[in-house]
Amino acid sequence: MQIQDQPHIGVLGADPAAITQFLRRVQALGGEHAVLLPLSPAAVPDCEPYLCGASTQPPLPKLRAAAEVLAASGCTVIAVPDSAGIFCEQLTAAAGVPVLSTADAVLPQLVGALHQRVSILCTPGVRAANAYGLTAQRYGLHCGYPDAPVQALLGCVRPEKACSEQVLRSIIELELARGNDSVVLDSAQLCAAFAH
């Protein structure tokens, strides 16, 4: 298969670490070949403070311009594996190609699971924007987030800390014991904690 015949997938994010983690996961999956074009535009304001209301610097203008670059480069779909996923509708409108967040990719996979209750372990910004809650409604899923003490523990999980995987596994077990059928990790940092 010639490179021009392969799917071209843009990978867009404000957080280079999230893009790197996403690319590692795609590589580990193997499967069909696709051309992946990662782009993390310079000087994009951090999405987290903006989504939490702690900053007035909107990341959307730079992200919109980057999505347009990816579409102009031949990408037929764009994945957004970080907090910037909350802007997928606006990015799709700007780029003219589908722009998918982690929520858009994960939640349809959970339809039909037991009682369809899912707990989302994510950053404070994703939680504040209720990115998963809004998407879950489209699929008839009940989406929840950990309570404040558990959310605070999530902030302590770092890939470089030896205890992080154990803490994260305990949080997952707690969320399952609370009646959730599934637990979704929506953070490059949380996913990387399992890699060490």
Residues of each region from the PLM?
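Non-catalytic structural scaffold of enzyme domains
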Residues: 1-196
